[in-house]
Structure formats: C-alpha cells, structure tokens
C-alpha cells in the first residue's frame, strides 16, 4: 500500500502472492497433466475412495456399539419446583399458581410445572399447578394447604 493512501477498506489489497490461481489438472502433458498428480494405476488413480473407507479394516461406524432403547416422542417435560423453593418464595403462605411462579421468576412461561417434595414447608399453601409428586402433596396437606392439579 502506498504511503499517500489512507488505511481505508476500499484501499486494502491482498499481499502479493497471497492469492494464487487454482491449478487446472489433467490438461495436456505438462505439469499436473496426464496422470494429474494421482500416480499410475490403482484404485485411487481411477476413482475417488470414500473418506470413511479404511482399506478393508472394520470401519469405525461398525466397531462402535449400537444405541440401546429409544426416545419417547410423547414424553411430557416438566419444569421442577421443590417445596424449599416454594417456602422461600411464599414465606407468608398464600396461593401458588403457574402465573405467579412465572412472575416471581421461578419458572419460564409456556411450559408445564411440577412441584416435587424436596425440603420442608410450614405455611399453608393453595397450590394450583400442572402436576404434584406424592411426597409434595402429603407435605402440603399436612401443613394445612390444598393441592389442585391441572393435568
């Protein structure tokens, strides 16, 4: 780049020799002609061997074990909230709904919520969520609360 040209995007050029033209092989008998860099005879001179081919050795995709089982396409995914989290979010007790949990940032919206029984609760909660585990239901009712499942 000349000294009088300022460093701007329209003045940039690649360094000399940085960009070279693609070599066209197999055109005449000069350099890279005739056999075109493939040597003489043999499989690799005649056609391309697949990259996965290992020369007769048992290929990797056949050496590895098959995956067992299957993925259930109808599985229902729940966002989990434990009782200790509910006790922290509602220290005075009250009504617990999915919308309320979303507003408090405990769960994301537009997905199912399940309450699990990890932790203890001492205040009465009126829980209305998509699903509740058995242990959580026992602990909530023992504390004087009620449980309503939406699903």
From Swiss-Prot:
CC annotations in GO: cytosolic large ribosomal subunit
Q: Which UniProt keywords apply?
A: Ribonucleoprotein, Ribosomal protein, RNA-binding, rRNA-binding
The record, for Gene3D superfamilies, names: 3.100.10.10
Biological process (GO) annotations held by this record are: translation
Which PROSITE patterns does the record cross-reference, listed alphabetically?
RIBOSOMAL_L15
Domain of life here? Bacteria
InterPro entries, per this entry? Ribosomal_uL15 (IPR030878), Ribosomal_uL15/eL18 (IPR021131), Ribosomal_uL15/eL18_sf (IPR036227), Ribosomal_uL15_bac-type (IPR005749), Ribosomal_uL15_CS (IPR001196)
Q: Which Pfam families match?
A: Ribosomal_L27A
Q: Name one GO molecular function term.
A: structural constituent of ribosome
Q: Where is this region: Disordered?
A: 1-60
Q: Does the keyword rRNA-binding apply?
A: yes
What does the record note on quaternary structure?
Part of the 50S ribosomal subunit.
Q: What does this protein do?
A: Binds to the 23S rRNA.
What family does the Swiss-Prot or TrEMBL record give for this protein? Belongs to the universal ribosomal protein uL15 family.
- The name under which this protein is listed is Large ribosomal subunit protein uL15
Q: Which organism is it from?
A: Streptomyces coelicolor (strain ATCC BAA-471 / A3(2) / M145)
């Amino acid at each position: 780049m000349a000294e009088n040209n300022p460093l701007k995007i329209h003045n940039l050029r690649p360094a000399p020799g940085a960009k070279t033209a693609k070599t066209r092989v197999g055109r005449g008998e000069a350099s890279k002609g005739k056999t075109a860099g493939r040597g003489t005879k043999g499989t690799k001179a005649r056609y391309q061997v697949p990259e996965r081919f290992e020369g007769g050795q048992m290929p990797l995709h056949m050496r590895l074990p098959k995956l067992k089982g299957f993925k259930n396409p109808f599985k229902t995914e729940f966002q989990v909230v434990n009782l200790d989290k509910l006790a922290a979010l509602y220290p005075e007790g009250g009504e617990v709904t999915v919308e309320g949990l979303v507003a408090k940032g405990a769960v994301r919206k537009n997905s199912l919520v399940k309450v699990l029984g990890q932790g203890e609760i001492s205040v009465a909660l009126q829980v209305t969520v998509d699903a509740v585990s058995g242990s959580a239901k026992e602990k909530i009712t023992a504390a004087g609360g009620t449980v309503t499942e939406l699903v």
